[in-house]
């Protein structure tokens, strides 16, 4: 099979390619002028978005039609837009997919800024276990908003947490009761976390993977947010030297299954004796630590406590805090982004189709969305004889529960399109 032509998709002249210097340029101009530029490209070996040279330019003549895509993004006007031929390959969370097989509501892979350091991500994890929350961006933008709020007596603690996230743009407001709330700019890197924690039943769901990711800093923030410490002895007797007490942490906001998983995690990972019980007239769920485990837990989290919250520690554990803000430079990383609209683009004066070839990775980004760089026609004896395109309809038929806790879905999959065609 020599000199076999393999067909791939292309883009409309005006589709904007992201260059390595973070600017954009129309793909038609890059091709017609054979611009010697570097573009952003995804390197799967390092899981990074990196600069790569354009090594070939293709003007493949008129197209019958282009599909106009609008995809959510966090910056600018909140929308990525590009026009591709129906057979161009677009990257999705499940792999490469032809543009013509995508519909509104599907998700594609897009590059978005990641701003959080490992320390800051732990602040988010710990806060979500306590008083923090993540809410979707309601303006069809990619990313979710992280919010923290505390009463007037804990404003110093809130200020301490906010300083740990000090490089993230945020706004602060105080309500009529003196409670202070801090809202951070939408962060695309937290979108998947939001979807995993909030399953729609009003309670927070923390998976085994979530719990395994926790560090002592996250546990400290959880304790400072929702924990209470009752002193049982001031340590005046030899057998209680250093004092003793018992920790209770409210877990009412968590699902029933999550409460059990958290109790087991504390026992299995940290060797803590913890039990679940109902507290007060309202019967709120709390985790109660034994006296010995209370001291052991405080020893674990003491280096990560805010100075204003050290009253929740035994005297011998106070003054150990070593926490200081750790910021990192923003980097571009891949995240899923929802398609807002797909329609056939009206004919324009120029219907020519353009593509580029990128060195090494064979992909690039059009207005932030990851696309394949294959040219419209290539030749070579290793060309595939057929291409397969399968579309499956996935429907939820049953919710799987752990007690009263929804932990998954049973689904039915039906093949609704199965196309095999020569190139």
UniProtKB/Swiss-Prot annotation:
Its main location: cytoplasm. Keywords: ATP-binding, Autocatalytic cleavage, Cytoplasm, DNA damage, DNA recombination, DNA repair, DNA-binding, Nucleotide-binding, Protein splicing, SOS response. InterPro entries: DNA_recomb/repair_RecA, DNA_recomb/repair_RecA_CS, Hint_dom_C, Hint_dom_N, Hint_dom_sf, Homing_endonucl, INTEIN, Intein_C. This protein undergoes a protein self splicing that involves a post-translational excision of the intervening region (intein) followed by peptide ligation. It is found in: Cytoplasm. GO terms for biological process: DNA recombination; DNA repair; intein-mediated protein splicing; SOS response. GO terms for molecular function: ATP binding; ATP-dependent activity, acting on DNA; endonuclease activity; single-stranded DNA binding. Pfam families: LAGLIDADG_2, RecA. The keyword RNA-binding does not apply. GO terms for cellular component: cytosol. Can catalyze the hydrolysis of ATP in the presence of single-stranded DNA, the ATP-dependent uptake of single-stranded DNA by duplex DNA, and the ATP-dependent hybridization of homologous single-stranded DNAs. It interacts with LexA causing its activation and leading to its autocatalytic cleavage. Belongs to the RecA family. This is Protein RecA. It comes from Mycolicibacterium flavescens (Mycobacterium flavescens).
